């Protein structure tokens, strides 16, 4: 399938009209994002998810932290995070509540799948901080 120049320009104009942010905004916001797949030990996914979801309100700089079930893998979880910056994420790993969750959850983790670092630029419910 090829896209004609007119369609491309029309699409760009439509996106601009609805106010979607430009990729250039990424440099200004410097938000830090992570998306990762975590594999729980057999029949431990729900228990691991509960640990990951506990105490989320006490993470300074965390704009979004979503734990999702993988509908195709009964042992997999997807974690999607958005942070004010990479430093806030790094600092969170030293919080007592996060250290406790890591200690409690580690025996329930069988492994890890794909993981990606992203630069969030906005979205529903995600407000750039700068």
Which residues does each PLM region occupy?
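N-terminal secretory signal peptides and thylakoid transit peptides that target proteins
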Residues: 1-15
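An amphipathic, aromatic/His-enriched active-site/gating alpha helix that lines ligand/cofactor pockets
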Residues: 9, 54-64, 82-117
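C-terminal segment of N-terminal export signals and the immediately downstream linker at the start
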Residues: 20-35
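Short, well-ordered beta-strand segments in beta-rich or mixed alpha/beta enzyme
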Residues: 32-38, 66-94
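Short, surface-exposed ligand-recognition loops at beta-strand->loop->(often short) alpha-helix junctions
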Residues: 37-47
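Acidic/histidine-enriched, glycine/proline-rich intrinsically disordered or flexible terminal extensions
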Residues: 119-130
């Amino acid at each position: 399938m090829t896209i004609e120049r007119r369609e491309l320009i029309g699409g760009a104009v439509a996106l601009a009209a609805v106010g979607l942010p430009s990729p250039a905004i990424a440099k200004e916001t410097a938000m830090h994002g992570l998306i990762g797949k975590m594999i729980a030990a057999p029949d431990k996914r729900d228990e691991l998810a509960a640990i990951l979801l506990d105490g989320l309100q006490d993470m300074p700089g965390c704009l979004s932290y979503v734990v999702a079930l993988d509908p195709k893998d009964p042992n997999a979880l997807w974690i999607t995070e958005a942070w004010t910056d990479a430093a806030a994420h790094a600092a969170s790993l030293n919080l007592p509540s996060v250290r406790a969750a890591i200690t409690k959850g580690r025996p329930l983790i069988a492994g890890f799948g794909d993981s990606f670092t992203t630069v969030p630029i906005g979205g529903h419910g995600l407000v750039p901080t700068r």
